[in-house]
């Protein structure tokens, strides 16, 4: 079972996405902010899903940069899917090292398919 760290400050989104991914066989650790995501990374993960816009001034792209720069306990090459309701954030996410970028709202099946492709190689 692949372990996914889901970083999103919207509790409704987090609950829905977690349940749907769990139904598809993923283990999901939901984190509402960057600090909790960094702590969760220390317990191992196979991929991250990070919202670009988090509460309290947190920026998901900054979390992505810290992962890629080895400033967390996560593997710097771990797959990271960035999400945002603002499609203009995609370029910044890509430049920061996002593996994929999804514009909200997206279908749950799309997210599960993207994760499977990244983790299973196809």
Give the label of every model feature segment.
Residues 11-29:
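Two-component/phosphorelay signaling modules centered on CheY-like receiver
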Residues 106-115:
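C-terminal output helix
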Residues 10-14, 56, 89:
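Short acidic/polar segment at the start of the alpha1 helix of CheY-like receiver
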Residues 30-47, 55:
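Acidic, metal-coordinating helix/loop segments flanking the phosphotransfer/catalytic sites
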Residues 59-75:
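Short amphipathic alpha-helix used as the core "switch/output" element in two-component signaling
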Residues 62, 85-103:
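Alpha4 helix (beta4-alpha4-beta5 surface) of REC/receiver domains from two-component response regulators
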Residues 46, 72-79:
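His-Asp phosphorelay/catalytic-motif detector in bacterial-type signaling
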Residues 81-83:
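Hydrophobic/aromatic residues positioned on beta-strands within the core alpha/beta folds
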């Amino acid at each position: 079972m692949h372990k996914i760290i889901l970083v999103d400050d919207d509790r409704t989104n987090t609950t829905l996405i977690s349940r749907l991914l769990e139904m598809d066989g993923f283990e999901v650790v939901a984190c509402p902010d960057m600090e909790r995501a960094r702590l969760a990374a220390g317990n191992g993960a196979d991929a991250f899903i990070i919202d670009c816009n988090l509460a309290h001034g947190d920026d998901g792209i900054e979390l992505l940069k810290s992962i890629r720069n080895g400033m967390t306990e996560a593997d710097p090459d771990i797959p990271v899917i960035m999400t945002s309701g603002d499609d203009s954030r995609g370029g910044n996410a890509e430049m920061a090292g996002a593996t994929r970028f999804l514009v909200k709202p997206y279908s749950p099946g799309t997210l599960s398919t993207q994760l499977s492709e990244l983790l299973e190689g196809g």
